[in-house]
């Protein structure tokens, strides 16, 4: 079992420390669903999903602020994404606000935001959207080194009357540049990472989180062909430890937690279902993974409360998802399961041993 001493030791787990929500921009300080209306040439925007050139289209964003008053901002929208852009009936968008207009509003500090929409019309797709949103929120509970999110009950109105209006749940994601400024980080534009270039505590926490949601669609070592490292992980550094890269994950629609109809595990893994957890984390120096596990366990009650308390999640989805999340904590709390399903499956054991041997031989490095 993870000892009580380990659980109490999380105070030394630096990057996972909690940060006052007030340090985030106003939009991301509140987790209640924001009511908003997007009025724009949506059909024109969607029509560019397969185009090499995807233009911004002008529109308006109207929302209800915390005092109950209606506020209107100019916004431009552009289709974005990769797989979902081509596959989904309702592809994701990028919102571009005018900096001069957002001052003094709930959107203070916002410029460009990713908008995540349900893949299709219908209740089931909205529930899947909620589960991806909850994946982001789960990681926010585990560490302040995470993307802020805000749930939105969004009405879409086509300004050209080319399609019918509709209302769906959606959410926006904190911009990379804003995250970097908030955490005083620099984005690392690299093609790949070596094991010794990663910040170990953060990497261990990220990979335990990926196990929680059963996400196999990521990497902390490489990016897709022609893209910066890493796949569905943004790399950052901080000035005082510029040689150590901090991964921050995003895009969780392929996870077992969401269980999208199009999601499937990588062919090289010995599993057939995306909801089957299979640990792909890197082996870590002594104590690092233990501390990360202790930290995750210390957040168990808060994580479960998140899933229990969100009103937009249906009773069926809530019960099924709570059982799935609880089964993850059951692995971490059982010594035999932890050894078999996590510790014995870590990758790069030989590289880690070689690195530790080199450090022991030359302690000045």
Locations of regions flagged by a protein language model:
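Phosphate/dinucleotide-binding and metal-coordinating scaffold of catalytic cores
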Residues: 19-365
């Amino acid at each position: 079992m993870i000892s009580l001493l380990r659980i109490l030791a999380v105070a030394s787990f630096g990057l996972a420390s909690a940060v006052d929500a007030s340090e985030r921009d106003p939009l991301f300080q509140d987790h209640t669903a924001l009511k908003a209306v997007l009025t724009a040439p949506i059909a024109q925007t969607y029509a560019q999903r397969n185009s090499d050139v995807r233009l911004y289209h002008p529109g308006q964003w109207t929302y209800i602020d915390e005092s109950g008053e209606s506020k209107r901002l100019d916004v431009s929208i552009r289709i974005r994404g990769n797989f979902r852009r081509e596959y989904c009936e309702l592809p994701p968008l990028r919102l571009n606000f005018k900096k001069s207009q957002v001052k003094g509003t709930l959107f203070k500090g916002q410029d460009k935001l990713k908008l995540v929409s349900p893949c299709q019309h219908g209740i089931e797709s909205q529930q899947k959207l909620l589960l991806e949103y909850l994946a982001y929120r789960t990681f926010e509970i585990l560490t302040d080194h995470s993307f802020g999110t805000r749930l939105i009950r969004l009405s879409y109105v086509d300004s050209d009357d080319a399609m019918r209006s509709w209302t769906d749940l959606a959410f926006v994601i904190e911009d990379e540049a804003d995250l970097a400024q908030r955490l005083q980080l620099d984005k690392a534009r690299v093609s790949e990472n070596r094991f010794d270039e990663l910040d170990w505590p953060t990497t261990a926490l990220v990979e335990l989180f990926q196990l929680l949601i059963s996400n196999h669609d990521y990497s902390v070592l490489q990016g897709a062909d022609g893209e910066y490292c890493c796949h569905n992980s943004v790399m950052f550094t901080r000035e005082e430890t510029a040689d150590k890269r901090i991964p921050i994950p995003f895009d969780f629609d392929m996870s077992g937690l969401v269980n999208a109809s199009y999601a499937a595990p990588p062919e090289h893994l010995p599993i057939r279902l995306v909801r089957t957890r299979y640990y792909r984390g890197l082996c870590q120096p002594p104590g690092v993974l233990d501390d990360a596990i202790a930290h995750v366990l210390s957040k168990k009650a808060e994580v479960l409360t998140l899933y229990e308390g969100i009103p937009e999640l249906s009773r069926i989805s809530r019960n099924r998802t709570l059982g799935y999340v609880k089964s993850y904590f059951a692995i971490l709390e059982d010594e035999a399961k932890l050894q078999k399903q996590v510790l014995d499956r870590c990758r790069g054991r030989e590289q880690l041993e070689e690195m530790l041997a080199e450090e022991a031989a030359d302690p000045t490095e």
